Structures are given as C-alpha cells and as structure tokens.
Amino acid sequence: MLKILLPTLMLIPSTWLTNKKWLWPSLTSQSLIISLLSLMWFFNQSETTHFSNYLMTIDQISTPLLILTCWLLPLMLIASQNHLSNEPISRQRTFITMLVFLQLSLIMAFSATELILFYIMFEITLIPTLIIITRWGNQAERLNAGTYFLFYTLAGSLPLLVALLSLYSSTGTLSLNLLQLLPNHIPMTWANYSWWLACLLAFMVKMPLYGTHLWLPKAHVEAPIAGSMVLAAILLKLGGYGIIRISITLSPSMKELAYPFLILSLWGIIMTSSICLRQTDLKSMIAYSSVSHMGLVISAGNNQTPMKALTGAMILNTSDGLTHSALCCLAKYQSYERTHSRALLLSRGLETILPLMGTWWLISNLANMALPPSPNWMGEITIMTALFNWSSWTIILTDLGTLLTASYSLYMFLMTQRGMTPEHLNAINPTHTREHTLMTMHLIPIIPLMMKPELIWGLFF
C-alpha cells in the first residue's frame, strides 16, 4: 500500500520543485509509473483482504476502483496540459496539487476499514473538486455550480455522520472487519428507520439518485476537463462503493425501506435517458447519461440478491468510469478546442474533417450503449437478471432504459459526426498525438476487461 501512497504523496513537493519546462512531462511520467505499479493489486488471488493494516486494506471490492483512481491521474494531466498552458506557472502548480490531493483522498477512501475514516475522506474529496470547478471552470456559472455541489453534498453527508456516531455508541466499533461479525438484526422502530435512511442518503446524493441529481449537470458542465473526468469516472462511483460497504451494517429485516429507492432509481433511468434525447448541450447530455447508468447501480445496491446484483454493480462502476471519462475528453476536444461551442447543432459533420476522432467517438458510444461484449454490457445484463429474479415487472423499465440508452448514444454520435459541416467551421485544427494517446489509454483497458471480467466483479460471483 505504501508503494502507492508515498510516491503519490511525493508528487506534491515534486510539483513545486520541478523546473517549469519539465513540469508537465515529469509529473505525467511519475503518475503513469504509479498507475502501472498499482496494477500489481490485480495479481493477488486471495478472496480476503490483502496489503492490510489497522486502518486501510485492499480487497476485491476496492481493487478495481483503486486502480481506476491511479490510472486516471496521468490521463487528467495529459488532458489538462493544453487547457492550462496560458495560465501562470503558479496556478498550474496549484492545479496539479489539487489533482494529486484528490487522488490521495480517493485512495484512502477506497481502502479505509474504519467507517469514520471513510467518511472523512469521503468529505475531503469535496474540497479539491470544489476548488477545481470554481477556479478553473470556463464560465461565470461555475460559482453557481459550485454552490449546488457544496450544499447537496453536505446536506446528504451530515445525516451519515450522525448515523455513524449512533452506530458507534451501540456497537462500540466502526471497523468493517468487526461489524461483519455482529448480528445484523435490528428492531423495526422509527429511530432505526431514520438511521437506515441516514446511512444511505449521502451515497444516494453522491451517485446521484434521480431527484437528488440537480447538482451533477451543473457541476459537470461548468467544470474543466479534469473536473469532468474525475466526476464521471471516480466521484460518482464513490457513492456506489459506499452503498456496497455500508450494506453489511444494514438489517435485512428493513428491506421494505429499499423499495422507494429501487423504484425511483429505475424510474430515473427512463427519465434521464429521455432528457438526453432532448438535450442540445453535449456535456449536459454526458452528465445525464451518467445519472442514467448510476440508476442501475443504485437498483443493484438496494436489491436483495447480492450475489448477482452487486457483481453487476462492480462491473458497471468500473467500466462506466472509463467510458464516461473518454466521452468527457472527446467533448472537450470538440467543444472547447475546435468548435468553441457545446451546442450539438453547431458542431456537425466533424467525421469528414477529423476521421480518427470520429473513430474514437464511435467506439466510446458503442461502449456507452453497452454493446456486447463490452464490460458495460456484462454489468447491465447481470443487474437486469438480478432485478428480474427479484421481480419480473422490472424487466419493462430496464428494457426501456436499454432502448433509450442506445437511442441517445446513437443520437450523440450522429449529431456530432454526421451531416453537413457548418460553414463557420472552415478552419479546424488537426488532431494531435497527445489526444490520440489519451483516448487510447481510456479505451485500451476495456479489452482486457472484456477478456477477463473476473478482475472487476468483486467477491460476489
């Protein structure tokens, strides 16, 4: 564990001591080495925890998300280099420091064995993300987006703190290893109902559940490219990971309380997918697409057949992080660096001008619509099977959601790549090796995940 934490921590002094000429190449190379080192976590075949100590441990649930977190830092640095090239060097160093601090917080959150440590790291991720959005966002609306992000997250998280303190007063521990050994039968009282709701509310807001999702489109649209990538790839998945972890403390006798969340998440898949079909803003469409996919993960987390549903949630969490991060990069290269507009109608027919970029769009959209045998398809079909076993009526909503997902994914591709090129796009800059390298590093990991999906399906299969 220290092989990853200490080099990541040393990136902060390296950021401030490296010569400005070598700042971006040096930090990108170091972070890439750290991400390659993190792959060693895949090669532990133990079904229990490993690299363990009193406060932090790694198991098959946290391993995929930890590796995804480490893999994302060099990608964010590559994506942000051109965007920040005109900034003063001190601001560039501050930006990189925020990204490194965010990665450290996420690593500690995903590996925490104490629930209070997990809560602290869960909240600390808010600080660098908020700074990135409000300082390096592109428009004045970024301040409004930051306010939404701050208050939604805090309003959902404070009840979780009260619930954890209540759990500690009744059990005497917040260690996940010890909580698994306690009897999980809890009396059906209104106080315990409230405790159960408080445990899940923070993660529902973070994912987000339909109805608590209004902060995400604003934050996603106004954030710079690195902020959009980390939101889509990691921070939303932190909510799904929290649901999986906290579920061991929740009583099965309260399964009726999960029904409203489950129904609302399935209904949210339909609603957000329908909203995507009516969007004219490219980044907003990608944000609502994230909400739609997270609806399936929420329904899996609240399902009573964990052996299948949680496996699907783990697969979809990881693969969706890569796919949506890739879509954010493509939107950035198209919207901000070439057409200077997020409007779909003003950026049509780019496939004839940038054919290789059109190929990346096609692959990313096919992965987003869960085309077999992509990992997204494996996750979705596993969750849909588990939901069908729980109630056959859910197949109506999940099938309709799948149809709408395919529809808006194809709509996104056709609106950006096909048709007549607008007359104002008469001087488009060619693509660069940096951009193709970034897209390759996003989409190449999908291939081994297709060939060996057990790497990311956790302990539940």
Curated annotation (Swiss-Prot):
Q: How does it sit in the membrane?
A: Multi-pass membrane protein
Q: Name one GO biological process term.
A: ATP synthesis coupled electron transport
Q: Where are the transmembrane segments?
A: 23-43, 58-78, 92-112, 113-133, 148-168, 196-216, 224-244, 257-277, 353-373, 395-415
- What Pfam family is a match for this entry? Oxidored_q5_N
One GO cellular component this record assigns the protein to is: respiratory chain complex I
Cite the EC number.
7.1.1.2
Keywords from the named record: Electron transport, Membrane, Mitochondrion, NAD, Respiratory chain, Translocase, Transmembrane, Transmembrane helix, Transport, Ubiquinone
Signal peptide feature range: none
UniProt keyword annotation of Nucleotide-binding present: no
Q: Which reaction does it catalyse?
A: a ubiquinone + NADH + 5 H(+)(in) = a ubiquinol + NAD(+) + 4 H(+)(out)
Q: What is this protein called?
A: NADH-ubiquinone oxidoreductase chain 4
Species assigned in the record: Xenopus laevis
- Lineage of the species this protein comes from: Eukaryota, Metazoa, Chordata, Craniata, Vertebrata
